[in-house]
């Protein structure tokens, strides 16, 4: 009964509900753009696998929740880098570089600068460079998207290869706390760069 309650709660969690938004993209694009790479290159994982002669490139992108960008611009900037790095590492890769797209209202330069500051802080802490991007300060709203390129030299850690009886490892920093009223923990902004890297 307890497990059933947990499953039901997770199924209606805002983080899970928002995954439904991926369906239109999944219906539009090829599910296996690099078929020669097999299951590891199928879309829907934490990062895209792109063929390269020595090792494989990983690519990922995250759009940040508009309400987070609006209410917490610095933390949105920080999070945009963190979630991208997490996606690359989750697939066994090393982050190489990031790019961003920021849309904001020119009358709110402070918000724009806070987003940049949050991204810059995360880039320094994780030692991953922001190598370019796009800014538009003539928008009636604020929006943020960040993309990352990574490299994997060993096996790709893809959920497609999971099997019954596999061990599941969860690596967690138990320090930190929930961030304000949001349903996620912040265990990284105050952690040392050495621990995070």
Question: Predicted regions: what is each one?
Answer:
Residues 1-197:
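Helix-biased detector of long, well-ordered alpha-helical tracts
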């Amino acid at each position: 009964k307890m497990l059933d309650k947990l499953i039901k709660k997770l199924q209606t969690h805002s983080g899970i509900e928002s995954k439904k938004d991926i369906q239109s993209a999944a219906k539009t694009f090829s599910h296996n753009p690099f078929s020669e790479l097999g299951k590891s290159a199928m879309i829907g994982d934490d990062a895209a696998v792109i063929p390269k002669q020595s090792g494989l490139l990983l690519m990922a992108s995250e759009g940040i929740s508009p309400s987070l960008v609006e209410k917490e611009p610095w933390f949105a900037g920080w999070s945009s880098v963190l979630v991208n790095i997490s996606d690359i590492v989750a697939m066994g890769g090393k982050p190489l570089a990031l790019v961003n797209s920021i849309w904001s209202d020119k009358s709110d330069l402070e918000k724009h600068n806070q987003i940049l500051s949050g991204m810059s802080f995360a880039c320094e802490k994780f030692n991953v460079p922001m190598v370019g991007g796009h800014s538009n300060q003539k928008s009636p709203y604020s929006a943020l998207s960040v993309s990352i390129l990574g490299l994997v030299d060993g096996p790709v850690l893809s959920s497609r290869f999971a099997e019954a009886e596999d061990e599941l490892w969860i690596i967690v920093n138990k320090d930190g706390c929930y961030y304000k009223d949001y349903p996620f923990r912040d265990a990284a902004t105050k952690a040392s760069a050495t621990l995070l890297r």
